[in-house]
């Protein structure tokens, strides 16, 4: 009797467990979106209903400390490796490696030498090594062959490709026959305009509104593809932006002989490579030359920047105060908005918002580090993290206390495109969910009745058997 009882119990337990959850996807899905140069307080400069919709229905971090230097390529590589710039090797947008005797330049799009990228392993490679698929639409570095690998799907960088076309590719990859579980999407604004006009310009308002409109378009497309409630959407950036002016310019030619050094990287962190035998002369001429310029020998760079332990960091690094601009002379290009300054400055900090089945709702956290995103992604995707500088414990409170699981999609009547009122709170479950739970409950009840009948019959049979045992000795007497 015991084996039959156990079999029935196991069958009941299996059905009770599986029925309500049979509609759930097998794994978490994550989409990371970066709006380049989106400073943390842009959310409040003009109405941003779609950003606030995510904040209301997901999580928001007020202050994200990114890595020094606060530029595009170092910080985008930090987001996907969890490493400081000195550890992942992309120390600037423009670099010189004395070991390789090669240069790296974002300005000239000379960025495709794999050796510059292979001091670290981006998470899309780890994800693919675990048997999953990844996709990247214009994410910086994703079109570079790193450790003999590209993302499963990727778009070669082309600034002319529209945001809508990039979104279409992301949706296609998430809904393919062999879908991705990890996607990356990059957009150049508001960084481009921020450089041109400066973050304090009234012209920035329309650009921020347009980025919000594009986020609304992404939300609409995710809902249309029935992905909104099943994909964990993370919206972030690489850095902020500060206002500059031509009245705050530091000209290196006023202090240095240009024949004595090579300027590897420019404002606001000048990476200076002195010519052979000219180190002391260059350093002495520049140190103390301007009250708004701090000059470091490489070994004297502050530890808090985690920046000096890499061959690509030049022997002399000159850092301008916030809002000050470094030029060789006034004939060089000047930008009204700039970034790259000390990562402790609030104006250098980017945004961080997230929505999805793994995240809490209407929750705001005060602070995190950009290095923490990598460990969060590894946790969501159940990947073994490689060594990194972030901390999962620093961001675990962003997650729902319940075991993260995607929920079935339900169409909202509000598409969140161009609306100032993004609509009502999201539904937590849909009709398919309730149908699944109901079917599971009915099946459980049926098997419970069958089990009770089985137990009753077993008891009757046992009583009859015992009666025969009791009567048997009397017959023998």
Swiss-Prot record:
Zn(2+) 1 binds at residues 36, 72, 238-239. Glycans are attached at residues 101, 158, 292, 329, 362, 369, 382, 389. This is Ectonucleotide pyrophosphatase/phosphodiesterase family member 5. It is found in: Secreted; Membrane. PANTHER family: ECTONUCLEOTIDE PYROPHOSPHATASE/PHOSPHODIESTERASE, ECTONUCLEOTIDE PYROPHOSPHATASE_PHOSPHODIESTERASE FAMILY MEMBER 5. Zn(2+) 2 binds at residues 191, 195, 339. Its EC number is 3.1.-.-. Belongs to the nucleotide pyrophosphatase/phosphodiesterase family. The gene is Enpp5. Expressed abundantly in the brain and kidney, and at lower levels in the liver. Can hydrolyze NAD but cannot hydrolyze nucleotide di- and triphosphates. Lacks lysopholipase D activity. May play a role in neuronal cell communication. Binds 2 Zn(2+) ions per subunit.
